[in-house]
Amino acid sequence: MINITGLNKSYGKKKALDNLTLSIPSNSIYGLLGPNGAGKTTLISILNGLISYDSGEVTFFDLPLKKNLSAIRQRCSLIPQSLAFYENLSVKENLQFFAGVQKIKGHTLKDNLSYAVETNRLSSMMDQKSATLSGGQKRRLNIAIGLLNNPDVIFFDEPTVGIDPESRNDILDTIKAYKSDNKTVIYTSHYMPEIEKICDEVAIMNAGQIVKQGSISSMVNNEESQQVIVELYPHSSTYLSAMSRAEVTIVDQTTLLLTQSSSELIAQVLHQLEQQGIKIKQIRYGATTLESLFINLTSKGRTDV
């Protein structure tokens, strides 16, 4: 569906995207994760034709983006984090206005409007002023506006910001249902439970590159991604602080947490402890969470882009 190969984008001397390669399958909900400055906004802006890129190749539906930008944009929709409608207008007036902006008319308008309203359960509030809607209802109106062109690909940017847990779950269920309507969803969020609940696959970005991608289960259940807990006997050594780095967390004086289980890292840590005369009580494996994996993969190389 969406194939990105060797994508590069710089702002002056700062590289926002660095030879980024990614494939997003059709009819899936794909999570895009990354710390601030990882390049997510730049990537989403490129995919929506809002900014150009320096080099590389992007295709939608096997069509090159640069040569087919207008046709591709008609099949995509970006639903922003900020509320993009007029609060002084009713729900119906907002939907009609934005349909007019997109020049959607006739039977197409009727069908698309019906789909947008029904999937977001707005039928009972069509004549209500948008300013009087609850936080969750405003979010649903925001989504409905983004569905007026009946897109094949929907980009969601933090769609549940600032709403209560019940409304959040309601919106997530709505988004999950779009997959069964043969739509592809690209979903960005900093809230890991959301990603785990609705996404089929995830890509983790850092410093303009994809550092990990695949299904969440394959990521967290990968043998080398497992956490290793090293429990120590009480000791008076001050050496532990020198061992702290991205892969090794000093929980306390008697506990180390290794955020990956490679035999090389384990052997290195055990050798260092032995050299310092620190005795090991036990070593055990713990389950890795998406959040701990994310922190481990993105703890270095952050930029300001």
Question: For each predicted feature, which ranges?
Answer:
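Conserved ABC ATPase "signature" region
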Residues: 96, 100, 107-125
